[in-house]
A protein has these predicted regions:
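ATP-binding pocket architecture of kinase catalytic cores
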Residues: 18-122
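Conserved N-terminal boundary motif of the eukaryotic protein kinase catalytic domain
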Residues: 10-19
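Short, surface-exposed acidic
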Residues: 153-154, 239-252
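An alpha-helical support segment within catalytic cores of ATP-dependent transferases
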Residues: 2-8, 111-178, 246
Length: 260
């Protein structure tokens, strides 16, 4: 495999495994204490660099060792987070252990000082990105929540975007991970050890993370990615966050994510 010199010098002859979890389309090589992400999305590469630099010392997240672009590919070598993904069977088999850890993780995100945050991902920004994805035909219509499209849903991404633009909810600003699904949360020793894939992190509405975390819990409960866990009470997350769930906003931010 070809690697730029500045990356190769750090990893040459080191053993690695391939991480196949995730839907970004990037290749992820896992070394003992480093991770190398290789992809073609230059925008995500720049967003990730900005946010990982900003979050150093503020949140448990990878530290950038080297990052560069060459021949149309983006390379980012980072420190490896200890622990296991929150979607590991030992956690999804035990809601009583997993849910309090996730709730603590969300509260940890909310406590990040947003002064000087390089990314403001409020709805103006998110909807503009969604509109561009629709116009360029980049939206995945297959890997979506049941009912998003079809007889009981929207006829197309264009119709979904129009609904999102016409039904914008009020926004409550907090720091957000941006894609808080279980594979992006790592746990070690019964607590959050780190967050990964922070390209869409920044200031946005409080329900951005709640909605995607809840969706991820429901999908894992229902067996979308493997074994079903029918007694897993995903709704218990809300009481652990000390909130009464706003079902309209949960739906809105889940649907918004279908255009990303």
């Amino acid at each position: 495999m070809y690697l730029p010199d500045r990356i190769r010098k750090k990893v040459d002859k080191l053993a690695y495994g391939i991480n196949s979890v995730g839907m970004s389309g990037a290749s992820v090589l896992c070394y003992d204490d480093m991770v190398l992400k290789i992809g073609r999305d230059a925008e995500d590469h720049e967003r990730s660099k900005a946010m990982l630099s900003y979050l150093e010392g503020k949140l448990p997240a990878p530290r950038i060792i080297e990052a560069c672009e060459e021949n149309g590919l983006c390379y980012m070598l980072m420190t490896r987070i200890k622990g296991k993904m929150a979607c590991a069977g030992e956690y999804t088999d035990n809601a009583a252990e997993l849910l309090p850890i996730l709730a603590d993780g969300i509260k940890l995100l909310w406590r990040v000082d947003t002064h000087g945050c390089p990314q403001q991902n409020m709805l103006d920004t998110k909807l503009a990105h969604a509109r561009r994805s629709v116009e360029l035909g980049l939206c995945d219509e297959d890997n979506v929540q049941p009912g998003t499209y079809g007889p009981d849903g929207f006829s197309s991404p264009k119709e979904l975007y129009a609904w999102l633009a016409a039904n914008r909810p009020d926004e409550e600003r907090v720091f957000s991970h941006g894609d808080l699904c279980l594979p992006n949360v790592f746990i070690d020793g019964g607590r959050i050890s780190g967050f990964i894939d922070l390209g869409w992190a920044g200031v946005t509405d409080i329900y951005q993370d709640i909605a995607l975390c809840y969706r991820s819990l429901v999908n894992n409960r229902d067996g979308k990615y493997g074994t079903a866990h029918p007694y897993f009470d995903a709704d218990a997350l809300f009481s652990l966050l000390d909130i009464e769930p706003d079902r309209d906003k949960l739906y809105y931010y889940t649907m918004l994510d279908e255009l990303f």
